[in-house]
Regions:
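N-terminal loops that bind phosphate or other acidic moieties
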Residues: 1-216
Length: 216
């Protein structure tokens, strides 16, 4: 797989993105099915056209015939969860989300960190985590988007994005920016000097007294 190739090339962290034209609707259905939230709660209100309620009813009329609803994901066995997610992706996931789901699973199997950003990449993360809950330890949100779908995904996963730039652009921009955060964090862990190594004088009195010893 492509994740295997990147791992063989020595990569430890990857950023994912999407370019699909229909992917937003796909991510809405995928997210609502996995988290259990109502379509009405994650549809965006618009000044013109059908109301949120009308749009939600239209989506229901199309999706419900495919029997993708799951009352309790936690009650399913591993194989049942996998089959249910595969059925969901086949019906409503779209190529972008289906491919990204497989890629995330492959990357996590190699203990590679995966940075995601918007509602579409978040839907793939939800699908991957539903198939294998341990994947959650390897996924990192990056930019905070105002999309209700994206907010619901982060709420369900229990994670918070760290970049707040009011981004409106997809195609992995937010994920790529998130790579810099991980890179900086690793430099701090591995390369940052201690006060002693940097020859910073220890406090002679006050709260910091006695916490370190300077070089003679």
């Amino acid at each position: 797989t492509y994740a295997d190739k990147l791992h063989a090339d020595g990569l430890q962290v990857v950023a994912i993105g999407n370019v699909g034209e229909r992917a937003f609707l796909d991510s809405l259905v995928t997210t609502a099915t996995i988290t259990g939230c109502a379509y009405d709660d994650i549809l965006v209100h618009t000044e013109c056209g059908p109301t949120v309620e009308e749009r939600a009813a239209h989506i229901h009329s199309f999706v419900d015939r495919f029997n993708i609803a799951v009352d309790d994901w936690s009650a399913l066995s591993e194989s049942e969860r996998r089959d249910a997610v595969l059925h969901l992706l086949q019906v409503a996931g779209g190529l972008d989300i289906a491919f990204l789901t497989g890629f995330i699973l492959g990357a996590a199997s190699h203990r590679m960190a995966v940075v995601f950003d918007n509602a579409v990449t978040g839907a793939a993360v939800l699908a991957a985590v539903t198939i294998e809950p341990l994947v959650k330890d390897y996924v990192f949100p990056s930019a905070a988007y105002e999309e209700p779908i994206h907010k619901e995904q982060c709420r369900f996963l229990g994670i918070k994005p760290c970049l707040h730039y009011n981004l409106q652009i997809d195609e992995a921009l937010g994920s790529t920016m998130g790579l810099s955060i991980i890179d900086a964090s690793m430099h701090m862990l591995n390369d940052m000097k201690t006060f002693v190594e940097a020859e910073v004088k220890a406090a002679e009195d006050g709260a910091g007294k006695g916490r370190q010893k300077n070089k003679e």
